[in-house]
Amino acid sequence: MGGGWWWARAARLARLRFRRSLLPPQRPRSGGARGSFAPGHGPRAGASPPPVSELDRADAWLLRKAHETAFLSWFRNGLLASGIGVISFMQSDMGREAAYGFFLLGGLCVVWGSASYAVGLAALRGPMQLTLGGAAVGAGAVLAASLLWACAVGLYMGQLELDVELVPEDDGTASAEGPDEAGRPPPE
């Protein structure tokens, strides 16, 4: 069985690479009392964070776009499954049973995409260089889109029935008794 040479090479490299990372890092002992947590005692005492470069901004922008694309993919798949459910719902009684499955699948896609986006925003807010307000706006937009989808599917399935009653305006000119000009009986 040929081709196994790379496995041994990868295992050797992994052993060499991880040997250093499994050991605790050596801390330099410079100045100050042992175990002091006072400011000014440490390797980075008084150091300000490095300035943000154009490359860091570009990386943050790419990370945000990739994150938004992932959400939009899940949302698109949820809309597609819901659309198939709408078509199936109109076909027949058997189609109605299948439509509920498609609506459920669409809902799972929308909920999973929205939840993963919100959790990712909270976890990656620093690397994305987002302010708290920017992250809140992003999460709010995703929540609004998800609620809009849920309302649309609920209305379509009849769970949120809206009864609209048209009441004709009575201006006093029409007679309440007898047929109208076309010979139709009065509405009841």
From Swiss-Prot:
It is found in: Mitochondrion inner membrane. InterPro entries: TMEM160. Belongs to the TMEM160 family. The chain crosses the membrane at residues 102-122, 135-155. Residues 1-96 form a transit peptide. It comes from the Eukaryota. The keyword Phosphoprotein applies. It comes from Homo sapiens. The modification Phosphoserine is found at S48. It is a multi-pass membrane protein. Residues 24-52, 168-188 are annotated as: Disordered. This is Transmembrane protein 160. Keywords: Membrane, Mitochondrion, Mitochondrion inner membrane, Phosphoprotein, Transit peptide, Transmembrane, Transmembrane helix. Its main location: mitochondrion. GO terms for cellular component: mitochondrial inner membrane; mitochondrion.
